[in-house]
Swiss-Prot record:
Belongs to the DAN family. GO terms for molecular function: cytokine activity. This is Neuroblastoma suppressor of tumorigenicity 1. The keyword Signal applies. It comes from the Eukaryota. The lineage of its organism: Eukaryota, Metazoa, Chordata, Craniata, Vertebrata. Pfam families: DAN. It is found in: Secreted. Interacts with bmp2; the interaction is blocked in presence of nog. May act as a tumor suppressor. Cytokine that has an axial patterning activity. Acts like bone morpho-genetic protein (BMP) antagonist in embryonic explants. Blocks the bmp2 activity. Residues 1-17 form the signal peptide.
């Protein structure tokens, strides 16, 4: 009986400890692990030539558990979930060539380059939209609409001689 009282008291204390959890009392010989592993990533886009880049992927085994509940509920639900995910990353622009596409001969793809991984609470993900928006704020090539910052960016070909003088002047002003 005292063992169950002890477990009933210590289990909630252990459960509500600051995440991530590296060891569980029920499995003292097992520990969580998460690391960034080198990979070759293929970046592609329809109608464009793919590129191979060096990147990292998060790989590991993190703890999650759910303790049976009671009704009526006497304590908060005892559920915990950790996942191996990036804790440090940068966004790079990878430019793909699109031969045969005169309107958009190149496409920029944003790629998350993972630097470091660890066990983090499930659902805790970095804001991809905010990170992508910052990448485009720091590039001075073109002004983009918010919709363009959420996926890929098309490069328009340089102005040709047959373009109108007003169009050529506008493009010249945007480069200065």
């Amino acid at each position: 009986m005292t063992v169950w009282l002890l477990i009933g008291f210590l289990l909630p204390v252990a459960i509500f400890a600051a995440p991530p959890i590296n060891r569980l009392a029920l499995f003292p010989d097992k520990s969580a692990w998460c690391e960034a592993k080198n990979i070759t990533q293929i970046v592609g886009h329809s109608g464009c030539e793919s590129k191979s880049i060096q990147n990292r992927a998060c790989l590991g085994q993190c703890f999650s558990y759910s303790v049976p509940n009671t009704f009526p509920q006497s304590t908060e639900s005892l559920v915990h979930c950790d996942s191996c995910m990036p804790i440090d990353s940068v966004w790079d622009v990878v430019t793909l060539e699109c031969p045969g596409n005169e309107e958009f001969p190149r496409v920029d793809k944003l790629v998350e380059k993972i630097l470091q991984c660890s066990c983090q609470a499930c659902g805790k993900e970095l804001s991809q939209e905010g990170a992508m928006f910052n990448v485009y704020l720091n590039t001075a090539e073109e002004t983009l609409s918010p919709a363009e910052t959420l996926g890929h960016h098309h490069h328009r070909p340089p102005a040709r001689e047959e373009d109108s003088p007003a169009q050529s002047q506008r493009e010249g002003e945007s480069e200065e």
